[in-house]
Amino acid sequence: MSLLDPRQFLLPAFYLDPTTQALLAQAASTSPCNKISSSSSFRISDILEQSPNNSSHSNDHDPSPQSIKSDFSTSPRASSPGGDRMGSPGSCKKSRKARTIFTDKQLQELENTFEKQKYLSVQDRMDLAHRMGLTDTQVKTWYQNRRTKWKRQATSGMDLLSEPGNLSAVQNLIRSSPYWANYITALPMGTQLPMMGLPMSMIVPPAHAFQPSSSSNSPSTHISSESPQLDVSSNSE
C-alpha cells in the first residue's frame, strides 16, 4: 500500500500538470535557499532527514550566545572620559598620608623647644629634625599644629578672663601664690600683665613682704600679712 502525497489534494491542477512539475523542479534546482522538489513530502522520515541539514545551515548564519559572549570578553573595552574616575569608589578619594607617631622623648624635646621658641627658622628646624631623627616636614607639621593649639588656648583664656568674677580669681591666685609672685617680681617694675592690663606694683606685693619662715625648716617662703591689697578701683580711674 503506497502512501498518498498531500499535495495532490491541495493543488490537484498543478500536481497533475507535467509542465508545472517541470517548472517546480527547475526552480528547486536553481534556488539553493528554497529547495522545492517533487519528491519532498510530509512524511516523518523525510522531515527527520531534513532537520539536520536545516540546523547546520542555521548554525552557519546565526551566532550562538557562547560565541557572542566570547567576542564581547575578548574585544577591548571602550574607555569613556569619566571611566577612570568611576572605576572604583576609593579612587575618587584623595589618599591620606600616614600620621607620624612620635616617641615620648621626641615629644618632650619638641615641647621644650616650643616653650622657648614659638617660631623656628629653616636652619633651626633642620637642626632639630636631624638631632631627633625626623624629617624637616615632620617637624614643620608638628610646629604648625602646636601653634594652632597654642593660639586656641590663648583665645579661650582671654574669653574666660572677660567673664565676671574670673579676673578677680586670677588676681587672687597671683597674690597668694609664691610661685607667681617670685616670677613676676623678677620682671621690671611697671611692666603690665597682658591678660590683666594692670601694673605689677598693683598686683604683686613688694619683695620685702616675703620672709622665710622661722617655725619651719621648709625653705619655702610665705606672704606677710602686711602685703598690700589689690585696689582695682584705682585702675578704673
Curated annotation (Swiss-Prot):
The keyword Cell membrane does not apply. It is found in: Nucleus. Residues 49-98, 209-237 are annotated as: Disordered. InterPro entries: HD (IPR001356), HD_metazoa (IPR020479), Homeobox_CS (IPR017970), Homeobox_TF (IPR050848), Homeodomain-like_sf (IPR009057), HTH_motif (IPR000047). Residues 95-154 bind DNA. Residues 68-78 have a biased composition (Polar residues). GO terms for cellular component: nucleus. PROSITE patterns: HOMEOBOX_1, HOMEOBOX_2. Residues 212-228 have a biased composition (Low complexity). It holds the Pfam family Homeodomain. GO terms for molecular function: DNA-binding transcription factor activity, RNA polymerase II-specific; RNA polymerase II transcription regulatory region sequence-specific DNA binding. Expressed transiently in embryonic CEM (cephalic male) sensory neurons. Disruption phenotype: Worms undergo programmed cell death of CEM (cephalic male) sensory neurons in males. The keyword Transcription applies. Keywords: Developmental protein, Differentiation, DNA-binding, Homeobox, Nucleus, Sexual differentiation, Transcription, Transcription regulation. SMART domains: HOX. GO terms for biological process: cell differentiation; negative regulation of apoptotic process; nervous system development; regulation of transcription by RNA polymerase II; sex differentiation. Cell-type specific anti-apoptotic transcription factor required for the sexually dimorphic survival of the male-specific CEM (cephalic male) sensory neurons during sex determination. In hermaphrodites, the homologous cells undergo programmed cell death due to transcriptional repression of ceh-30 by tra-1, the terminal regulator in the sex determination pathway. This is Homeobox protein ceh-30. It comes from Caenorhabditis elegans. The lineage of its organism: Eukaryota, Metazoa, Ecdysozoa, Nematoda, Chromadorea.
